Curated annotation (Swiss-Prot):
Activity regulation info: Strongly inhibited by Hg(2+), Cu(2+), Zn(2+), Pb(2+) and Fe(3+) ions, and slightly inhibited by Na(+) and K(+) ions. Beta-mercaptoethanol and 5,5'-dithiobis-(2-nitrobenzoic acid)(DTNB) cause 34% and 42% inhibition, respectively.
Family: Belongs to the peptidase M20 family.
UniProt xrefs under Gene3D superfamilies: 3.30.70.360, Zn peptidases
Temperature-activity profile: Optimum temperature is 60 degrees Celsius. Shows a low thermostability, retaining only 20% activity after incubation at 50 degrees Celsius for 30 minutes.
UniProt KW keywords: Amino-acid biosynthesis, Cobalt, Hydrolase, Iron, Manganese, Metal-binding, Nickel
GO biological process, one term: amino acid biosynthetic process
Enzymatic class: hydrolase
Catalytic activity: an N-carbamoyl-L-alpha-amino acid + H2O + 2 H(+) = an L-alpha-amino acid + NH4(+) + CO2; N-carbamoyl-L-methionine + H2O + 2 H(+) = L-methionine + NH4(+) + CO2; N-acetyl-L-methionine + H2O = L-methionine + acetate; N(alpha)-formyl-L-methionine + H2O = formate + L-methionine
pH-activity note: Optimum pH is 8.
Binding site for a divalent metal cation 1: 87, 98, 194
Full protein name: N-carbamoyl-L-amino-acid amidohydrolase
Gene from which the chain derives: hyuC
Amino acid sequence: MAAPGENRRVNADRLWDSLMEMAKIGPGVAGGNNRQTLTDADGEGRRLFQSWCEEAGLSMGVDKMGTMFLTRPGTDPDALPVHIGSHLDTQPTGGKFDGVLGVLSGLEAVRTMNDLGIKTKHPIVVTNWTNEEGARFAPAMLASGVFAGVHTLEYAYARKDPEGKSFGDELKRIGWLGDEEVGARKMHAYFEYHIEQGPILEAENKQIGVVTHCQGLWWLEFTLTGREAHTGSTPMDMRVNAGLAMARILEMVQTVAMENQPGAVGGVGQMFFSPNSRNVLPGKVVFTVDIRSPDQAKLDGMRARIEAEAPKICERLGVGCSIEAVGHFDPVTFDPKLVETVRGAAEKLGYSHMNLVSGAGHDACWAAKVAPTTMIMCPCVGGLSHNEAEDISREWAAAGADVLFHAVLETAEIVE
């Protein structure tokens, strides 16, 4: 006789309906969402999620970072829980699925267990981490970072948004300051299901990404100092052009990333010119280089080479150059046993799959410091994310949720 839940699927329609219902909260201007952390919309989304969880029989705990832990009890009171987590907060111009898919698929896994009358030895905890995005309060993955001991609670509370409001004050204001000590919970395992946020799965026509690693990164902030001058009347050989120096550094970063394949990336997404006038050569340019690799030695080698070559480029142009490392985390290797559990679930269910390295940071990257951890990914249309046009299909969402359901059941141990 088949074991409870054997080859069963989650309720795809219920999952999709929940995603669409959550997306009504904090609507964006172009079909996505603006539900930034600790806003009124975030509070409303949390309350909706809480109500769904309580309807499913889960009990809630909230820690001093506002992270929500919704627990389905296991049969063994001494067994550590299996966590399923992600985030409900979004970018200012975010999509409906980034983070939200993982949280609501965790809830759907529990709902399906209830439907099938499944009991597990280990408790199941569905987790909504606070401020994963870092869009309003930098840095990203803040609550999971405090949980893992990367940041202090005091540091987190002192983070300020662009309006000068502090994380701690806003956490109190929306009513989600809990009393549970951050990091007090111990985990048997941690699973996170997420959209890929890249184009590989769709291009390869695969339904499931089995995530083996998270890339490490360095963020290097450059300040280049040139001389403001008229773009029309300053001869080419008499310019001290900070903008030209930046362009040559960007080309060098591209070369360094290409020479450190496979897996390395590098680029610039933020830059500021001063005085930023169309007919004035910039006297100052500030920009941030983002380099990533799943290989620690390559990552550190890329940083060293960029920091060595950039000043030489600037010196040849007479431009001043200073570099500050403003962000970093090491590459993460996910738990091999859990990775194989995910792969086995995909194979059992007949879903096409491939290994992936996550190019983006996730709460799972910090969870891996304190518990066996892995991730599951599904495709997203065109690889778009952090964009209101972010989209997935109902079938993609359900396939990953099915794999999550079976991988969690195997790890939490069904009691017959």
